[in-house]
Amino acid sequence: MNDTGSHFDVPEEATLPEDLRKLFAKARERLGFLPNVFRVYSYRPQRLSAWFAHYRQLHEPTENLSAADREMIAVVVSAANGCLYCLVAHGAALRVELGDGVLGERISYDWRRAGLDARRRAICAYAEKLTRDPRNVDREDLQNLLNAGLTPEEAWDVIEIAAMYNFTNRLATGTNMLPNEEYSGQARP
């Protein structure tokens, strides 16, 4: 095991393709550290590139689905799955995006009791149901998102973001990825 916690060897950064080395440099510049998700996923460099391209597309804010909403979905799914890495990392990102560490913490622990408005409650309920009980997701669940003010495209994004984090949670948990310590101090109340 290494400092990422991964059960797999983490490649030396110098051995990675140039596009990933540039991505790592940008992450360090923006965050002040290199997230372990990049280090661990670099075990399969081409897949990391594809995963990150998809991640970036899904995290583009829209009129009714903000960056904070998108991080909130990641947190709700990660909490439902018990994914340590993603819950810590996206919990930190949610606190930053909300500009409200208290609300971010409440959502991370129990979105139902966080004092969310009806739109955000509908988003969280959908993401959690798709995670915990996918076989029973139906048209009514989708309609709840639309009734909450999301466009069909934004409802699609809720579905796709939840699906991506279900995948990512399983990869992070399966590899034994540990969150960077730096996340713990970000945007705390």
Predicted regions and their residues:
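Hydrophobic alpha-helical segments
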Residues: 1-189
